[in-house]
Regions:
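Canonical tetratricopeptide repeat
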Residues: 74, 108-109, 153, 188, ...
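Structural marker of alpha-solenoid helical repeat scaffolds
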Residues: 64, 98, 143, 177-179, ...
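TPR alpha-solenoid repeat register
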Residues: 71, 105, 150, 185, ...
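N-terminal leader/linker segments that initiate helical-solenoid repeat arrays
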Residues: 16-74, 237
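Terminal, low-structured helical/coil segments at or just beyond the last alpha-helical repeat
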Residues: 195-237
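Structural signature of tandem alpha-helical TPR/SEL1-like repeats
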Residues: 47-56, 82-94, 118-138, 162-174, ...
């Protein structure tokens, strides 16, 4: 039993030593650019002692920051679920300050700004919030190019809010590269093509939906849209 406890202690100590060594090397590398070799050597033991002394405090602060980010994320989602869109956006913004490369936070932040914009009467304020939503969706995609909800959502903005259907085509094609049976994206892509005057592409999409979809609602909608388009009576919205 004593041998087992000794082995556990040695293993834990070795783990701590390795982590402290890695932390020392990382910090030392930061200073190496502007300190001379003699200066680095002179402060080596001081730095190692500081790391050993403050390691537990540093770990607590890191963990506290993670907990704070989770708090803002959870509160933001609760606000969003209760349709308190600006309060939710503020919480996701706070979480982003801590967890700055998390695509989920940017996606939900974008969703909040987009939904909030619909409540505004002032067109300038509405447009400003739509642009923030666009920026956040694009950041989501930059961080995770396969985030299909963001690809679809930013395309909705480009088609219905920003009148940039050409940009919607770009992101919808990215989405459909990996989700070939995403019929909502197909309908939106057809809409974008129509707005660009590329009606033959839209008809091809409707034919594909009619041929491949097992959903009777999708089939009928595609058939109706195709007929309206062929009869030149398609309603853009």
């Amino acid at each position: 039993m004593k041998k087992l406890l000794l082995l556990i202690f040695i293993a834990m100590s070795a783990g701590c030593s390795r982590e402290e060594k890695m932390l020392y090397e990382n910090i030392n590398e930061m200073d190496a650019e502007y300190l001379s070799t003699d200066e680095l050597k002179a402060r080596e033991q001081e730095l190692k002692n500081s790391i050993s002394e403050y390691r537990s405090i540093l770990e607590e602060k890191i963990e506290a920051a993670r907990d704070l980010a989770s708090y803002h994320k959870i509160l933001g989602k609760l606000y969003l679920d209760n349709r308190m869109f600006m309060l939710a956006a503020e919480q996701f913004d706070e979480a982003i300050k801590i967890d700055s490369e998390n695509p989920v936070l940017f996606y939900y932040g974008a969703l909040c700004y987009s939904r909030y914009s619909k409540s505004l009467m002032n067109q300038s304020e509405q447009y400003s919030n739509i642009l923030i939503a666009e920026k956040y969706y694009l950041k989501t995609i930059e961080l995770d190019s396969s985030f299909y909800k963001a690809l679809y959502a930013v395309s909705v903005l480009y088609v219905f809010e920003l009148d940039q259907p050409d940009r919607a085509v770009e992101y919808l094609e990215m989405l459909l590269d990996t989700q070939k049976s995403n019929y909502d994206a197909m309908f939106l892509l057809a809409n974008a093509y129509i707005r660009l005057g590329i009606t033959d592409q839209a008809i091809d999409i409707y034919n594909n939906i009619i041929k491949t979809s097992k959903n009777s609602v999708y089939k009928k909608q595609a058939e109706d849209n195709k007929k309206k388009l062929q009869d030149s009576g398609y309603e853009w919205n």
